[in-house]
Regions:
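Short beta-strand-to-turn element immediately C-terminal to the catalytic PLP-Schiff-base lysine
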Residues: 1-3, 16-18, 42-44, 55, ...
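Active-site PLP-lysine loop of aminotransferase-like
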Residues: 4, 32-33, 72, 149
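Long, acidic (Asp/Glu-rich), low-complexity accessory segments flanking structured domains
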Residues: 44-63
């Protein structure tokens, strides 16, 4: 995406830049999302032919939002996948770990936590699937996508946090996978638009008033 004039939104277009002299990248290390690379990209005196214009200036934001309507629910589902793994680990741990003569799953506090975690995951999944079904039907889905992204990633982070609590001191050690899951799930609240941005988008749709600034 490149800016072609000073119009905040209308001046943006999409161009395809081929690797050539003046194109440089440097990797950026992250706390999570390491299955995909993140890098700083520098263009120094790079020339791009007009034929490499993929989306004309003024149309890029529309194309971006169409893309985000499909990708935001997917981000939610990825985060909820981590949460599901954390729940599975917590169930096993609660069944195996004993205190006061019985598995900790037999204590009301732990049992209630597990029930709440499972419910949050299922609610997040349903919201994501609703948004994606709208995409499949060709319906406008930007609000559902924003709701899905915010709620799903928020619930996922809460679930993984509770998983760490259930594991107690073991949860912060690298001997148990919830430590890694805790780091892995947090970036989902930032990627594809922060959760704060999602809330503003939802609020604008409800009131018709833009509070972005």
């Amino acid at each position: 995406m490149a800016r072609f004039n000073d119009d905040p939104a209308g001046g943006l277009g999409l161009i395809l830049v081929e690797r050539q002299h003046g194109y440089q990248t440097s990797d950026i290390e992250k706390m999570g999302l390491n299955s995909q690379s993140t890098a700083q990209v520098v263009f120094q005196d790079v020339r791009v032919p007009k034929t490499n214009m993929m989306v004309a200036p003024g149309e890029a934001m529309k194309a971006l939002f169409i893309s985000l309507a499909g990708s935001r629910p997917l981000v939610s589902l990825m985060a909820l996948g981590v949460a599901q793994a954390a729940l599975d680990e917590s169930i096993r741990y609660a069944q195996d770990r004993s205190q006061f003569g019985k598995p900790i799953a037999g204590h009301q506090l732990i049992s209630a936590k597990l029930g709440e975690m499972a419910t949050k995951i299922e609610a997040g999944k349903l919201l994501a699937l609703q948004a994606l079904s709208q995409v499949d039907r060709g319906e406008r889905s930007d609000v559902s996508a924003a709701m899905s992204k915010w709620f799903g990633t928020q619930m996922a982070c809460e679930v993984v946090g509770e998983a760490l609590q259930i594991h107690g001191g073991n949860g912060i050690t690298k001997e148990y996978p919830v430590e890694y899951m805790y780091r892995a799930v947090r970036p989902f609240m930032v990627t594809e638009g922060t959760n704060e941005i999602q809330k503003l988008s939802i609020g604008r749709a409800l009131t018709g008033i833009d509070a972005f600034g």
